[in-house]
Amino acid sequence: MKKIEAIVRAEKFPEVKAALEERGFYGMTVTDVKGRGQQGGMQIQFRGRTMEVTLLPKVKLEIVVKDDAVEEVIGLIVNSAFTGSPGDGKIFIIPVEDVVRIRTGERGDDSL
């Protein structure tokens, strides 16, 4: 099993979620986060003043999948989050040793 953590543009998250759900990937944890990568930040005008925004709003999506679904999920996220501009995000793939469903005690792949 692998945990896929994806940081994507907040405005692209609805497309990412729809793409995953369309292929049967429903279980996920979603967190509103702020961050930045190589793009740095951006300048905005607010009440006639220029302000530097160094941390941009993003969405962090966490989903645990069986090993044979990892590449499909990565492809769905990349295809739906892509704009081609700096700030599209990152995907991290992390090994998961075990999962326990609290309600039933099921473990491993059966608990997903």
From Swiss-Prot:
GO terms for cellular component: cytosol. It holds the Pfam family P-II. ATP binds at T29, Q38, Q39, V64, G87, D88, G89, K90, R101, I102, R103. ADP binds at T29, Q38, Q39, V64, G87, D88, G89, K90. One of its GO terms (molecular function) is ATP binding. PROSITE patterns: PII_GLNB_CTER (PS00638), PII_GLNB_DOM (PS51343). Keywords: ATP-binding, Cytoplasm, Nucleotide-binding. SUPFAM superfamilies: GlnB-like (SSF54913). InterPro entries: N-reg_PII, N-reg_PII-like_a/b, N-reg_PII/ATP_PRibTrfase_C, N-reg_PII_CS. GO terms for biological process: regulation of nitrogen utilization. Binding of adenosine nucleotides results in distinct, cooperative behavior for ATP and ADP. GlnK2 is completely insensitive to 2-oxoglutarate at a low level of intracellular nitrogen. It is found in: Cytoplasm. Involved in the regulation of nitrogen metabolism. Regulates the activity of its targets by protein-protein interaction in response to the nitrogen status of the cell. Regulates the activity of the ammonia channel Amt2 via direct interaction. Homotrimer. Interacts and forms a complex with Amt2. Belongs to the P(II) protein family. This is Nitrogen regulatory protein GlnK2. The lineage of its organism: Archaea, Methanobacteriati, Methanobacteriota, Archaeoglobi, Archaeoglobales. The gene is glnK2.
